[in-house]
Amino acid sequence: MSIEALKTQLPAFAKDVKLNLSALPREDSLTEQQLYGLLVACGYTTRNGTVAQALEAEAAPHLSPAALDAAKAAASIMAMNNVYYRFTHLASNKAYETLPAKLRMSVIGNPGVDKVDFELWSLAVSAMNGCGRCIDAHEAVLREAGLSEAQIQTAVRVGAIIASAAVALEAAGAGFPEAAE
């Protein structure tokens, strides 16, 4: 499956989603690895198998096996970090911020791809998961590395488009097998 195949599964009410998905491969402010890694990381972050499989199929010809694995690693490690750090940030009891996390996250230090690309994928996933602390941390690293605000915004926009595709599928019943009964 690909973006084109995914679009055919979207309902009529999701015309804007289809148009936004169509524009993704033409995005030119990011490198090929950055863009296609975003498709994979954000696709898996939706937790929608149809979306994840379609975007991985679209991205695979453009990514090395190491980059494909790193994009999946960004989705999985941020799933953990976003829950944990969103809790420590939002909890009224600030003592939680002083406790050691005791979470293994060595992939962040050695992702197997350019660290800037991994940070960009992590930022988009963090935006999708709503972790303000992680968003700020990744955005600061990316700005320090020289990425522009427009490039950072593009990454988050890609995540937003992908999230909207998953919701459109689910709203149409494609993501809930029990809805077909």
UniProtKB/Swiss-Prot annotation:
<keyword id="KW-0575">Peroxidase</keyword>
<comment type="similarity">
    <text>Belongs to the AhpD family.</text>
</comment>
<dbReference type="GO" id="GO:0015036">
    <property type="term" value="F:disulfide oxidoreductase activity"/>
</dbReference>
<keyword id="KW-0560">Oxidoreductase</keyword>
<dbReference type="InterPro" id="IPR029032">
    <property type="entry name" value="AhpD-like"/>
</dbReference>
<dbReference type="Pfam" id="PF02627">
    <property type="entry name" value="CMD"/>
</dbReference>
<feature type="active site" description="Cysteine sulfenic acid (-SOH) intermediate">
    <location>
        <position position="134"/>
    </location>
</feature>
<dbReference type="GO" id="GO:0045454">
    <property type="term" value="P:cell redox homeostasis"/>
</dbReference>
<dbReference type="InterPro" id="IPR004675">
    <property type="entry name" value="AhpD_core"/>
</dbReference>
<dbReference type="GO" id="GO:0051920">
    <property type="term" value="F:peroxiredoxin activity"/>
</dbReference>
<dbReference type="GO" id="GO:0032843">
    <property type="term" value="F:hydroperoxide reductase activity"/>
</dbReference>
<protein>
    <recommendedName>
        <fullName>Alkyl hydroperoxide reductase AhpD</fullName>
        <ecNumber>1.11.1.28</ecNumber>
    </recommendedName>
</protein>
<comment type="function">
    <text>Antioxidant protein with alkyl hydroperoxidase activity. Required for the reduction of the AhpC active site cysteine residues and for the regeneration of the AhpC enzyme activity.</text>
</comment>
<dbReference type="InterPro" id="IPR003779">
    <property type="entry name" value="CMD-like"/>
</dbReference>
<dbReference type="InterPro" id="IPR004674">
    <property type="entry name" value="AhpD"/>
</dbReference>
<keyword id="KW-0049">Antioxidant</keyword>
<feature type="active site" description="Proton donor">
    <location>
        <position position="131"/>
    </location>
</feature>
<keyword id="KW-1015">Disulfide bond</keyword>
<dbReference type="GO" id="GO:0008785">
    <property type="term" value="F:alkyl hydroperoxide reductase activity"/>
</dbReference>
<keyword id="KW-0676">Redox-active center</keyword>
<feature type="disulfide bond">
    <location>
        <begin position="131"/>
        <end position="134"/>
    </location>
</feature>
<dbReference type="GO" id="GO:0006979">
    <property type="term" value="P:response to oxidative stress"/>
</dbReference>
